[in-house]
Amino acid sequence: MDLFEYQAKKLFAEHGVPVPTGKTATTPEEARAIATELGGRVVVKAQVKTGGRGKAGGVKVADGPDDAFAKATAILGMDIKGHTVHSVLVEEASNIAEEYYASFLLDRANRTFLAMASREGGMEIEEVAATKPEALARIAIDPLKGVDAAKAREIAVAAKLPEAALDGASELLAKLWTVFVKSDATLVEVNPLILTGDGRVVALDGKVSLDDNADFRHPEHEAFVDVAAVDPLEQKAKEKGLNYVKLEGEVGIIGNGAGLVMSTLDVVTYAGEEFGGKRPANFLDIGGGASAEVMANGLSIILGDPAVKSVFVNIFGGITSCDAVANGIVQALKIVGDVSTPLVVRLDGNNAEEGRRILAEANLPVVKPVDTMDGAAKLAAELAAAAA
């Protein structure tokens, strides 16, 4: 999960990383009130989960409360790279002497952690890496040792930071590492990291990506979820413990195993070309779950999408037997109730024949058993086209 700047800075502040004083506003009136409280010049910054805000006009300096009102009016509602601005961060303006760059990230290729730092801050780090690679220090971090004061200073020196910034930057880097580890982050980035006119080192911006796989250790991370941006069906699936991603098609997909579901998406897309370009409406992997409750939850979520005109249930029985899945489907339809959307069901593998027999005996009008994956995909696309 990527955080907004204000959320990243909240984490920073909790671990002692110096950040400018500021608050978020969702209306120009709130921005004016915050500017009045802060006094002096302020910066009004669009809160979106993408880069390039400054170039897009999403970061503006205001000379007082009324100017903050005007700047917030201009920024709120903006579209920045497909992201609508719903809030702004209003914070005290900083006296910037120099700008640097610092980050900690998960280095997947080398199966370790990596620190990156540079004296060239305030611009896209990809640009620095491409045009001046020698200006970007890369320091591998031993996961068992982490970043102590000595390691933090090593990073700052490798980045060729000036003497005036070394102590402050080293202290900040050590605290930034604590944020990275304690929050189970995959990325913690400060760009720019600034040296102020009075010699302080401050995180002027902040970017944090949290590892969703560690959510069970961090119930407090739930507060960071951008509810306005989360699809309600995806949120419902998450609450039910289902791996669901909403897509833009008409054929609902249920499968067991991510690989099989991905293959199903491809097969349905191919089959749909014959029927006006019908496409998968979702990704839903029920894993080893064949219970009536799991199937009912899955069907309820998929059928909650008004774009879905048919459902393709594609199961390859392994540890989970096909007869258990078939019973789950029969019971799920009773639980969900009043289902008119056709379900094309393909069962193969462990106890497939028994599963097909169960579905046949249930004699459910909406269930359309098909033996092959290609045949089932074609029928699902055809039924979706007929219902459109």
UniProtKB/Swiss-Prot annotation:
A Gene Ontology BP annotation from the UniProt entry: succinyl-CoA metabolic process
UniProt xrefs under Pfam families: ATP-grasp_2 (PF08442), Ligase_CoA (PF00549)
Annotated organism of origin: Frankia casuarinae (strain DSM 45818 / CECT 9043 / HFP020203 / CcI3)
UniProt GO cellular component terms: cytosol; succinate-CoA ligase complex
Free-text cofactor note: Binds 1 Mg(2+) ion per subunit.
Family, as annotated: Belongs to the succinate/malate CoA ligase beta subunit family.
Reaction catalysed by this enzyme: succinate + ATP + CoA = succinyl-CoA + ADP + phosphate; GTP + succinate + CoA = succinyl-CoA + GDP + phosphate
Database matches in NCBIfam families: PRK00696.1 (NF001913), sucCoAbeta (TIGR01016)
Keyword Transcription in record: no
Cofactor(s) listed: Mg(2+)
Single GO molecular function: succinate-CoA ligase (ADP-forming) activity
Functional summary from the UniProt entry: Succinyl-CoA synthetase functions in the citric acid cycle (TCA), coupling the hydrolysis of succinyl-CoA to the synthesis of either ATP or GTP and thus represents the only step of substrate-level phosphorylation in the TCA. The beta subunit provides nucleotide specificity of the enzyme and binds the substrate succinate, while the binding sites for coenzyme A and phosphate are found in the alpha subunit.
Pathway: Carbohydrate metabolism; tricarboxylic acid cycle; succinate from succinyl-CoA (ligase route): step 1/1
Binding site for substrate: N256, G318, I319, T320
Residue stretches making up the ATP-grasp domain: 9-236
Record-listed ATP binding positions: K45, G52, R53, G54, E91, S94, E99
Keywords: ATP-binding, Ligase, Magnesium, Metal-binding, Nucleotide-binding, Tricarboxylic acid cycle
Listed EC numbers: 6.2.1.5
Subunit structure: Heterotetramer of two alpha and two beta subunits.
Binding-site residues for Mg(2+), renumbered to this chain: N191, D205
Protein name: Succinate--CoA ligase [ADP-forming] subunit beta
Disulfide pattern: none
InterPro entries, alphabetized: ATP-grasp (IPR011761), ATP-grasp_succ-CoA_synth-type (IPR013650), ATP_grasp_subdomain_1 (IPR013815), Succ-CoA_synthase_bsu_CS (IPR017866), SUCC_ACL_C (IPR005811), Succ_CoA_ligase-like_bsu (IPR005809), Succinyl-CoA_synth-like (IPR016102)
Domain of life: Bacteria
Alphabetical list of SUPFAM superfamilies matching this protein: Glutathione synthetase ATP-binding domain-like, Succinyl-CoA synthetase domains
